[in-house]
Amino acid sequence: MYIQILGSAAGGGFPQWNCNCVNCAGFRDGSLRAHARTQSSIALSDDGINWVLCNASPDIRAQLQGFAPMQPGRALRDTGISAIVLMDSQIDHTTGLLSLREGCPHQVWCTDMVHEDLSTGFPLFEMLKHWNGGLSWNRIELQGSFVIPACPNLRFTPFPLRSAAPPYSPHRFDPHPGDNIGLLVEDTRTGGKLFYAPGLGKVDEALAEKMRDADCLLVDGTMWDDDEMQRRGVGTRTGREMGHLAQNGPGGMLEVLEGFPEPRKVLIHINNTNPILDEDSPERAELARRNVEVAFDGMSIEL
């Protein structure tokens, strides 16, 4: 299985266009050793030719331009994107669909809840019907697994995550299973397994079993501290309130990851306020001590 990190930041990217927190300002003036990051998205393939796009970031055009296999050049109009899987209906995971309109129709896999959000509060399915049929919906059932025909050796097993639906969702304050999902993706030839959950608010025992079964954990790295945005003066809500488990503190992501010594551990969906973006920070050193990696745009993983 080929895994390509197209974007590794949370919503807004890094540096965020309107933010002058210590990270964003430090990056701009050159005092912070860090790398710019686009908004979170990955691509998966079983042959390096046909790719499944997991989430469509607002930065999708730049991301595709930076990854040559996404433009194989086999025809006058072409793309390496064979299907799209949406983990949720958040703006930073779906807005890129608008930029892919010239390539419609697209095969899109998502849950009932996500499809409802994207047909009502943020009606991308309706809007894009005007471009060659738009988006062809394939329902993700939360029981069992599914295979996408373009990548027949990859088996996708979805699981519901405790996180938050977006503000425009009809059930914003009435959570449902399927508002947010994670994926366990297995290459049935190599046996390699990826656990992918860019928005992860809580890890229970059922979820821990899936993580234990994986060779690589690509998980929520949004915040270092739960009250990070409050302390930095850029927000009022905690990480948990937004559906993100912070890395630091009792029961945090680092403590969770300590329970899985075997898999490769990689953080993705990193907010611009997170001190791990500073490559010289003590927090980044703590990750290195724990053998936890920080995803970056253009990172490649093979399982």
UniProtKB/Swiss-Prot annotation:
Gene Ontology BP annotations: pyrroloquinoline quinone biosynthetic process
The record's annotation in NCBIfam families points to: PQQ_syn_pqqB
Name of the encoding gene: pqqB
Q: What is this protein called?
A: Coenzyme PQQ synthesis protein B
Annotated coiled-coil segments of the chain: none
Q: What keywords are annotated for this sequence in UniProt?
A: PQQ biosynthesis, Transport
Transport found in the keyword field = yes
**Which pathway?**
Cofactor biosynthesis; pyrroloquinoline quinone biosynthesis
What is the stated purpose of this protein? May be involved in the transport of PQQ or its precursor to the periplasm.
Q: Which HAMAP family match?
A: PQQ_syn_PqqB
Give the record's family classification: Belongs to the PqqB family.
Q: Which organism is it from?
A: Pseudomonas syringae pv. syringae (strain B728a)
InterPro entries xref list: Metallo-B-lactamas (IPR001279), PQQ_synth_PqqB (IPR011842), RibonucZ/Hydroxyglut_hydro (IPR036866)
